[in-house]
Amino acid sequence: MFTLKKSLLLLFFLGTINLSLCEQERNADEEERRDDSDKRDVEVEKRFLSTLLNVASKVVPTLFCKITKKC
């Protein structure tokens, strides 16, 4: 009976440690996800600005040509 209690106590202790480690890992993952959304916003902003610059580089010369009528 004593050895059974000892074994159960050991299993309970190891399970508690395991759950604690999983919780810490889960918290770290949540923090990473929060940081990732900021990085994604920056990446989207960079893509948007580069697309806008590409369009502007094609449209501005055409507009300048039509306004000055020196085509």
Curated annotation (Swiss-Prot):
* Gene Ontology biological process terms in this record: defense response to bacterium; defense response to fungus; killing of cells of another organism
Instruction: Kindly state the tissue distribution recorded for this protein.
Output: Expressed by the skin glands.
Its subcellular locations are: Secreted
What cellular component GO annotations does this protein have? extracellular region
Q: Where is the signal peptide?
A: 1-22
Q: Which residues form the propeptide?
A: 23-45
- Give a Pfam family name: Antimicrobial_1
Task: Tell me yes or no: is Transmembrane helix among this UniProt entry's keywords.
Answer: no
Q: Which UniProt keywords apply?
A: Amphibian defense peptide, Antibiotic, Antimicrobial, Cleavage on pair of basic residues, Cytolysis, Disulfide bond, Fungicide, Hemolysis, Secreted, Signal
Report disulfide bridges, numbered on this chain.
C65-C71
**Chief localization class?**
secreted
Q: What job does this protein perform?
A: Antimicrobial peptide active against a variety of Gram-positive and some Gram-negative bacterial strains. Has antifungal activity against C.albicans ATCC 10231 and a slime mold isolate. Has hemolytic activity against human erythrocytes.
Q: In which family does this protein belong, per the annotation?
A: Belongs to the frog skin active peptide (FSAP) family. Brevinin subfamily.
Q: What is this protein called?
A: Brevinin-1CG4
Tell me what organism the protein belongs to.
Amolops chunganensis (Chungan torrent frog)
